[in-house]
Amino acid sequence: MENVGKKFLPVTAAVTGLGTAAVKTAADFDSEMSKVSAISGATGDDFDQLRAKAREMGAKTKFSASEAASAMEYMAMAGWKTSDMLNGIEGVMNLAAASGEDLATTSDIVTDALTAFGLSAADSGHFADILAAASSNANTNVSM
């Protein structure tokens, strides 16, 4: 019986490791979403919508839900409201994916630039497309 236990030890360790990683991933996501809530003031239904959108983006893009939440944090710091974040996150994520840049950094760049140009969150998708084209055509990257 002792031999059987020794044979299962690597399997048990692997399963425990997966469980630990899943708990950490969930905790990271919750931590990021708490920051979004604190900065944006989103509660109740607004917060639930943001949380669902971050999870959706994590499921359908190369980025995780935690990374999407981190991008929303920068949007919240820029004063974006819930509807702005819900509508703007896809354009920012597409730009980050196309450019290979970090998602949170890309969100920071887009929100800062929109503010500097006096544009609104509604312009984020178009603005992200322009940045992607400019960086591609100018042999540079989005952060330069």
Language-model features: where?
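Small-residue helix-packing and pore-constriction motifs in hydrophobic alpha-helices
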Residues: 1, 7-59, 70-78, 85-99, ...
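N-terminal glycine-rich anion-binding loops that anchor highly charged ligand groups
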Residues: 61-64
